[in-house]
Swiss-Prot record:
Annotated region described as Disordered, given as residue ranges: 1-59
Gene name in the database record: NDC80
Similarity comment text for this entry: Belongs to the NDC80/HEC1 family.
KW Repeat (keyword) present: no
Species annotation: Arabidopsis thaliana
PANTHER family: KINETOCHORE PROTEIN NDC80 HOMOLOG
Disulfide bonds listed in the record: none
GO CC terms, sorted: Ndc80 complex
GO MF, any single term: microtubule binding
Assembly and interaction partners: Component of the NDC80 complex, which consists of NDC80, NUF2, SPC24 and SPC25.
Protein localization: Chromosome, Centromere
Transmembrane portions of the chain: none
Assigned keywords, A-Z: Cell cycle, Cell division, Centromere, Chromosome, Coiled coil, Mitosis
Record's protein name: Kinetochore protein NDC80 homolog
Length: 568
C-alpha cells in the first residue's frame, strides 16, 4: 500500500555538534513514494516514469538505504538492506524489531506488527502502514512505503540515542540566583536546617573560588619570574653581531657547496649533449617510419574506395535504417503510453479500494453499535459486489436493517409512555427543588461569613510574605557584599598583573636601549677602523712612492759607478 502523509512530522531539536546531512523532507519523500513505477514497468526494460523524475527517486532511495545501513553497522547489526534485489521478509521484520528495541519500545515477538502500527500512529508517522502490508513488505507495491518507514525509524532512533547520550542536568549558570531561590524556598517552608546547610555549602564554594583566584595570581607571579629569567638570559647570551657573523659563515659555506655542485653539473653537460644528439637521431628514424606508414594507409584507402558500391544501394540502406529507427521510436512511445494508462488505472483502482475499505470499517462499526452480527470483509480478488464486500446486501443486510427498524418503532411507543411518567416525576422534583433553594440561601449566608474570615487570613499571609521578602532582601544584600569583596580581590589581582606587565615592558625597553647603545658603539668602532684603514692606505702609498724613488736613485748611482768602472 502506498504511504500517504497522515499528519505533519514533529519538529525535533537538532543534534549537537556537526550534525549529519539533513534527511529529505516530507514533501520529497511523499513525491518519491507517490511516483513509483507501475506493475507493468517491473516486467519491462524501462520504467513507466521516464521523463517524470525516476532517476531522482532512485537516488533518494539509494541515499535512504545508505543511511539505514550506516546506522545498522554502527550498532553491529548483522543484516543490511539492499535496493536490488529487495531483501527478504525475515530481514525486513528483524530490522523493524531492532529499530523498535533501539527506541526502547517494548515489542512482542509474536504480535510485533500490531505494536509497530500502534507505535507509528502514536508518533504521528507521515507514512501509513498496515498489518497486511507487513506480511509481504518486499512486494513492489509495499516496498517503497516500508523503506520510508524504516528510514524514518532509523532517524528517530538516532535522535533518541543522541538525547540519551547528551542528557544534561538543569543549568546552574547564575549561582547567586540559584542560591537565593533555594534559600528562599527553604525559608518559606520553614526548613532552617536546610537553609544553614545551603549557606555553608555556598560559603565553601566562595572559598574555593577565592583559592582558585589566589592560585591564578601565584601562577601570574611565576610567569613574571620566568619572563624576568628569560630577560636575563637574553642579556647574558651572545649579541646580535655574533649571531649574524655565525649566520654569515654558514652562508659562505653553503655558497661554496653550491659552487662545487655547479662545477659538477657543468662537467656533466657534454655527456648529456651527446645523449640528446642520439635521441634526436632516433626521433628522425621514427618520423621516417611514420611517413612510410601514412603512405601505406593512403594506398589502402584508395584501394577501399575503388571497390564497387553503388549510391542507390547506400541510399536504400539508409532509408531502411531510418524506417526501422522510426518504428522503434513509435513502439517505445506507444509502450510508454500504455504503461502510463495502466499506472493511472491501477492508482484509480487502489484509491477506490481504499475508499471501500474505509467505508466498510465505518459500516462495521455502525453495525456493532446496532448490535447486528453482520460484518463486511473486503476481498481484493472478488469479481461481484457481494464477493468484494463479503456479504450480500439484499439477502442479508437489508432484512436485518428492516427488522431493526421495526424494533425501533415498537421501542419508541414504549418511550412515549415512559415520557409521560417522567413528566409527573418532574413536577414532584420541582417542588423538592424549591424547598432546597431555601436551604441554599441559609448556606450562602454561612459561606459569606467564611469568606470574610478567609480575607482576614489572606491579609495575615500577605504580611508574613512581606516580612519574608524583607529577610530575603537582606540575604541578597549580604550575598552582594560578598560578591563585591570578590570583585575587589579580582581587581587587585588584575592590578598586580598590570604592574608586572609594566615592569616587563620597562625591562624590555631598557634592554632595547642597551642594545641600541652597543650598536652605536659598534658603528663608531667601524667608522674609526675605516678611517684607520684609509690612513694606513695613504701611508703605504707614500712608502711605496719613497721606495720607488730610492730604487730609481740607487739604479742611477749604480749605472754611474758602472760607467766609471768601464772607463777605467
Amino acid at each position: 500500500m502506498r504511504g500517504g502523509a497522515a499528519g505533519k512530522r514533529r519538529t525535533t531539536v537538532g543534534f549537537g555538534g556537526a550534525p549529519p546531512p539533513p534527511p529529505p523532507s516530507i514533501e520529497q519523500q511523499r513525491h518519491l513514494f507517490n511516483s513509483r513505477d507501475s506493475d507493468a514497468s517491473f516486467a519491462s526494460s524501462r520504467p513507466s516514469s521516464i521523463g517524470l523524475g525516476g532517476r531522482g527517486a532512485s537516488d533518494d532511495r539509494s541515499s535512504m538505504i545508505r543511511f539505514i545501513n550506516a546506522f545498522l553497522s554502527t550498532h553491529n547489526f548483522p543484516i543490511s538492506i539492499r535496493g536490488n534485489p529487495v531483501p527478504s521478509v525475515k530481514d525486513i521484520s528483524e530490522t523493524l524489531k531492532f529499530l523498535l528495541s533501539a527506541l526502547d519500545y517494548p515489542c512482542d515477538s509474536i504480535k510485533w506488527d500490531e505494536d509497530l502500527v500502534f507505535f507509528l500512529k502514536s508518533q504521528k508517522c507521515p507514512f501509513k502502514i498496515t498489518k497486511s502490508s507487513l506480511k509481504a513488505p518486499n512486494t513492489p507495491h509495499n516496498w517503497p512505503t516500508v523503506l520510508a518507514v524504516v528510514h524514518w525509524l532509523a532517524e528517530l532512533a538516532r535522535f533518541h540515542q543522541h538525547l540519551v547520550s547528551n542528557s544534561t542536568s538543569v543549568p546552574e549558570d547564575n549561582s547567586m540566583n540559584f542560591f537565593a531561590i533555594q534559600s528562599f524556598g527553604h525559608f518559606i517552608r520553614g526548613e532552617d536546617d536546610k537553609v544553614n546547610d545551603l549557606d555553608s555549602q555556598f560559603l565553601g564554594k566562595l572559598e574555593a573560588e577565592k583559592t582558585s583566584v589566589a592560585e591564578t595570581i601565584s601562577g601570574c607571579e611565576k610567569i613574571s619570574g620566568e619572563l624576568e629569567a628569560k630577560l636575563e638570559s637574553l642579556r647574558k647570551g651572545p649579541s646580535k653581531k655574533e649571531s649574524l657573523e655565525k649566520v654569515k659563515a654558514d652562508l659562505e659555506n653553503d655558497v661554496n657547496k653550491f659552487r662545487t655542485i655547479v662545477v659538477e653539473y657543468t662537467d656533466r653537460n657534454p655527456a648529456m649533449e651527446k645523449v640528446v644528439e642520439e635521441k634526436a637521431k632516433e626521433l628522425k628514424a621514427k618520423e621516417e617510419e611514420r611517413e612510410r606508414i601514412s603512405v601505406e594507409n593512403k594506398e589502402l584507402k584508395k584501394s577501399v574506395e575503388l571497390q564497387n558500391f553503388s549510391a542507390a544501394d547506400v541510399n536504400r540502406m539508409r532509408r531502411e535504417l531510418q524506417a526501422v529507427e522510426r518504428d522503434v521510436a513509435d513502439a517505445e512511445v506507444a509502450r510508454d503510453g500504455w504503461d502510463q494508462k495502466a499506472w493511472e488505472l491501477n492508482s484509480q483502482i487502489r484509491n477506490q479500494f481504499h475508499q471501500i475499505q474505509t467505508l466498510a470499517i465505518d459500516c462495521n462499526q455502525a453495525l456493532r453499535r446496532l448490535k447486528l452480527d453482520i460484518q463486511f470483509a473486503v476481498n481484493e480478488r472478488g469479481e461481484t459486489p457481494a464477493a468484494v464486500m463479503g456479504v450480500d446486501y439484499k439477502s442479508v443486510v437489508k432484512p436485518a436493517l428492516c427488522s431493526l427498524c421495526d424494533g425501533i418503532k415498537g421501542s419508541s411507543a414504549e418511550k412515549v409512555e415512559e415520557l409521560v411518567t417522567l413528566q409527573h416525576h418532574k413536577s414532584e422534583m420541582a417542588s423538592k427543588i424549591e424547598s432546597k433553594r431555601s436551604l441554599l440561601g441559609s448556606i450562602q449566608l454561612q459561606i459569606n461569613d467564611l469568606e470574610e474570615k478567609m480575607k482576614l487570613v489572606k491579609k495575615e499571609t500577605q504580611e508574613l510574605s512581606t516580612k519574608c521578602d524583607l529577610e530575603a532582601k537582606t540575604l541578597v544584600e549580604s550575598v552582594k557584599a560578598e560578591a563585591l569583596n570578590l570583585e575587589v580581590v579580582e581587581k587587585e589581582a588584575a592590578e598586580f598583573v598590570k604592574a608586572s606587565e609594566l615592569r616587563l615592558q620597562e625591562a624590555v625597553k631598557e634592554s632595547e636601549e642597551e642594545v641600541q647603545a652597543c650598536a652605536a658603539q659598534l658603528f663608531a668602532l667601524i667608522d674609526s677602523i675605516s678611517k684607520q684603514k684609509e690612513y694606513m692606505d695613504s701611508k703605504i702609498s707614500e712608502i711605496k712612492t719613497g721606495v720607488a724613488d730610492t730604487a730609481s736613485a740607487v739604479s742611477e748611482i749604480y749605472k754611474a759607478n758602472f760607467k766609471k768602472n768601464l772607463g777605467i
